[in-house]
Amino acid sequence: MYVMSQTTNTEDTIDLKELFFSLIAQWKLIALCIILSLICALLYLRATPDTYSVNALVQVEENKGASAALLGDLSSMIEQKQPAQAEIEILKSRLVLGNVIQHLNLDLKISGTENSFTDRLLSPHHYQTEYQPKSVLFKDDEKVFDIRQFNIPASFRDKKIELRFKDGQFSLTNTQTEQVILTGKTNQSNTLRTADGLWNISIYTQDQLNDVYLIQKQSLPAAVNNILTNYSVAEKGKLTGILGLNYQGTDKTHITQVLNAILVSYSQQNIERRSAETAQTLKFLDEQLPELKQQLDVAEREFNKFRQQYNTVDVTKESELFLTQSVTLETQKAQLEQQVAEAGAKYTSEHPVMKQMNAQLGAINKKIGELNATLKELPDLQRRYLQLYREVEVKQQLYTALLNSYQQLRIAKAGEIGNVRIVDTAVEPIEPIAPKKLQILILSIFLGGFLGTLLALLRNMMRSGIKDSTQIENELDLPVYATVPRSPVQESRINILKKKKNIPILAVKNSDDIAIESLRSMRTAIHFALSSARNNLITISGPAPEVGKSFISTNLATILAQSDKRVLIIDADLRRGYLHKYFNLDTQPGLTELLNGQQSLETVIRHTEVPGLSVISRGKSPANPSELLSSNQFKNLLEQMSEKFDHVIIDTPPVLAVTDGIIISQYTGVNLVIARYAKTQMKELELTLNRFEQAGVKVNGFILNDIQRSSAGYGYGYGYNYAYAYKANKESD
């Protein structure tokens, strides 16, 4: 159990290491994604205007209306405290925002026609709109025009209209029908009546304007909604009565101006509402005081008349007590009736406050009835005296109370300030709140790195080819003669080399390259394979194109020639062979011309700059390459070359594409198959072996080509590191 667990952990570690190295191998892809992500972020920051935010604070104080002067102690019962949510809705209402829109002409929207994301990215135009109480000023870089009147028919509200300037005139064009609505002169008032309605427009400018602009007169609901998209109100804390106002926009001066205008409008409507309540109460008192004064005068005349007629009346202590109680009850009744009349203007009879006040009034009437019944038992003269005296006292106290309330309300109206207090006004911001440039750049780096890593992983998953030589040896039971790493020199010049007519031989130009060192290590294995082979002919084949057959063939032939061997390399890929590019030769004369009898053997065998190395190019592409390669002429050619040279290397076409490689391998002693790292599939190698077996040909082994350094496993990585360390020491020597 322990051994199995340890093996599993080791395999997992190797897998993670291979994954890590595969990402390092694709660092260019990841870096490219990061760069592209940064470029996109920079373009976004260039095209996105800065967004600013302004704030203000409002305190909503306890609401004590003018009716409190009349209701007295009952005002605490009648008064309804307005929650913060009610004031928030008022701050968002058309009542408040409509005044701001009308005052600053915020219902007029002007923009350039080049205002899309792409236009802002490429166009140098800088547009700015300044809203003023009497006009709207629009700036296009250094050019300015001022709209002082723009009254249009209702049918054109909320519609974009093209505004064009030319030769001191302007024209308005319907963007939907592209028809000119009207034409007017600048720097004067223009009035025109059309079938749609009356137009009254005044545009002033001192500049020569030749551009086209879009102008829109919004309806009140649309203008309010336009403000509400960037405007918010919320209570600070819970039940604090402090409201926080926030407004955002791209023009910091404009948003500060708008938010302060909202504060002024809200404060004014609050004062006007409270003043209206006070005025309503004063109007009620103006109606009640003269009538009450008249009633008091009548009561006093009756009482004085009674006293003159009967001089003085002996009133007992008991009668005085009844009189005091009666006056108190009648005064309370009169005051309560006044309160009921005042509250009746605000509440229905079913309101709890009205029900409670009516219940109190009923209780007082009941007590007055009981007291009147007691007073009837007194002597007639005393009873009449008490009634008249009570009437005078009640009217006097009630009149005095209402007169005091009236004077207090007049003073309150003169100093009315409302129940809201502006704690903080809007102050022009300094720094924008968006876009957050540093965060966006950092995020773009992480996003680019993530996308690059994801693409690298997907690319690695798609590259499901052979990545380990042991996989070939275990599944196909054949040796891998060499694992050839990707040459750093070849990798850096691969795109250039494909386009050139001449491809340099790596074994000549960079003889100490790690790929060449791997091929040198294969010489011993080839020597043992040839010792038991029927001849010295070696075929280099592969299952598919672009596995590196020509690269391996050329450099292997060069290495063998450098060890004082006579080597011939034949380009048997008569369709697409390009061995001639390695030796800076023409394709003709070549193998095709030799087999067709058009050229002699001495003519097609050409010597190269590498001592001991000769080459036969493919020649002109024939119509029947398979027939030529299966002919006796080709067989005889190979037999002659086998005797003349120490090694004959034949570069063949892909086995799975055409049968040429199988035909050639029937004549050779050693057959090697090239597999490309992470590209060649195991299934391709199995099919290739089946093709050879069907033809009765033995495959000696494989060469795993183009192993990438950073994505190699432990064994490959060790070989790489050793080669690089050895090369570095050599250079230092």
Swiss-Prot record:
SUPFAM superfamilies: P-loop containing nucleoside triphosphate hydrolases. Autophosphorylated on several Tyr residues. Dephosphorylated by ptp. One of its GO terms (cellular component) is plasma membrane. The keyword Kinase applies. GO terms for molecular function: ATP binding; protein tyrosine kinase activity. It holds the Pfam family AAA_31. CDD domains: BY-kinase. It is an enzyme of class 2 (transferase). It comes from the Bacteria. Pathway: Glycan metabolism; exopolysaccharide biosynthesis. Changing K549M: Loss of autophosphorylation. NCBIfam families: eps_fam. Belongs to the etk/wzc family. May be involved in the production and the transport of exopolysaccharides. This is Tyrosine-protein kinase ptk. It comes from Acinetobacter johnsonii.
